[in-house]
């Protein structure tokens, strides 16, 4: 066991305490694998920017190109992946030491430029898609809707009747025609008859009211006369002396 002496302790017979010193291996000081492979590629060395302006301008030139967008981009991104896109990262599991899992293939982004194959193949693909769309456009037929609306019933013609005849006959003859004058005369006669009938009914009601009022006066006069006769009879019976044939006369007077 390796021990280190701590300086600064008194040497007058006191024993020096032995403590383990922190020794590190020079190879383990940094992260594993960084110092062992100085020639490893950087993280973003294999990536490059893609300029889509050429593709957008070329697609904007064709108006009916919606059906070919997926195929164009599939061909665009898959054309350069066939030339060896799978490569192993050098020294993957070997850098960590000991046996490790089987190396996995890493997908590598292709280094495209402005003059590569996708840019050169795109105009031909655009032209082919444009020809296909133009050839399919005349033969295309509109697809039926998923849930067609029920056919609307046409409104049935109105049934002939008096209302329709009356509406059709509203338009009368001209005012200067004899038929119009005859119709006006008939209307005037009917109005006069209705007015005369209302007047007669009103007169009859007034006459009946007068008769009932006169009869009421007669009845009131009759009631007054009977009341006077009753009062005279009472006075007459009060003046008579009590007789044996009138047993209840005194009781009646007492009341």
Swiss-Prot record:
Q: Note the position of the cross-link Glycyl lysine isopeptide (Lys-Gly) (interchain with G-Cter in SUMO).
A: 107
| Annotated bZIP domain residues | 177-240
Please provide, alphabetically and separated by semicolons, the GO molecular function terms listed in this UniProt record.
DNA-binding transcription factor activity, RNA polymerase II-specific; RNA polymerase II cis-regulatory region sequence-specific DNA binding
Segment Leucine-zipper: which positions?
Answer: 212-240
Q: Where is this region: Disordered?
A: 1-42, 91-121, 138-206
**Record field: compositional bias (Pro residues):** 141-161
Start and end residues of each stretch annotated as Basic motif:
181-208
Tell me the SMART domains matching this sequence. BRLZ (SM00338)
Q: Which domain of life is it from?
A: Eukaryota
Where is this chain primarily localised?
Answer: nucleus
> What Gene Ontology terms describe where this protein resides (cellular component)?
nucleus
- Name where it's found: Nucleus
Which Pfam families would you find in this protein's record?
bZIP_2 (PF07716)
Q: What's a BP term from Gene Ontology annotated to this protein?
A: DNA-templated transcription
Keywords attached to this entry: Activator, DNA-binding, Isopeptide bond, Nucleus, Transcription, Transcription regulation, Ubl conjugation
Output compositional bias ranges, type Basic and acidic residues.
163-187
* CDD domains assigned to the protein according to its UniProt record, in alphabetical order: bZIP_CEBPD
Family assignment from sequence similarity: Belongs to the bZIP family. C/EBP subfamily.
Assembly, per entry: Binds DNA as a homodimer and as a heterodimer. Can form stable heterodimers with CEBPA, CEBPB and CEBPE. Directly interacts with SPI1/PU.1; this interaction does not affect DNA-binding properties of each partner. Interacts with PRDM16.
The free-text function statement in the UniProt record for this protein reads: Transcription activator that recognizes two different DNA motifs: the CCAAT homology common to many promoters and the enhanced core homology common to many enhancers. Important transcription factor regulating the expression of genes involved in immune and inflammatory responses. Transcriptional activator that enhances IL6 transcription alone and as heterodimer with CEBPB.
Q: Please identify the protein, giving its name as recorded.
A: CCAAT/enhancer-binding protein delta
């Amino acid at each position: 066991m390796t021990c280190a002496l701590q300086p600064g302790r008194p040497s007058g017979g006191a024993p020096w305490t032995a403590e383990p010193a922190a020794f590190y291996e020079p190879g383990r000081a940094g992260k594993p694998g960084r110092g062992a492979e100085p020639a490893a590629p950087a993280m973003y060395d294999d990536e490059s920017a893609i300029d889509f302006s050429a593709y957008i301008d070329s697609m904007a030139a064709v108006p009916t190109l919606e059906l070919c967008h997926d195929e164009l981009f599939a061909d665009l991104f898959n054309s350069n992946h066939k030339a060896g896109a799978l490569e192993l990262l050098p020294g993957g599991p070997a850098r960590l030491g000991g046996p490790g899992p089987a190396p996995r293939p890493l997908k590598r982004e292709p280094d495209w430029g402005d003059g590569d194959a996708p840019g050169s193949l795109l105009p031909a693909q655009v032209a082919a898609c444009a020809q296909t769309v133009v050839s399919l456009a005349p033969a295309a037929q509109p697809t039926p809707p998923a849930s067609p609306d029920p056919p609307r019933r046409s409104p049935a013609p109105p049934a002939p009747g008096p209302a329709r005849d009356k509406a059709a006959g509203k338009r009368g003859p001209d005012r200067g025609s004899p038929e119009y004058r005859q119709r006006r005369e008939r209307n005037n006669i009917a109005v006069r008859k209705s007015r005369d009938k209302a007047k007669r009914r009103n007169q009859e009601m007034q006459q009946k009211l007068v008769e009932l009022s006169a009869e009421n006066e007669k009845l009131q006069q009759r009631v007054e006369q009977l009341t006077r006769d009753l009062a005279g009879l009472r006075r007459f019976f009060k003046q008579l002396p009590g007789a044996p044939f009138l047993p209840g006369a005194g009781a009646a007077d007492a009341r």
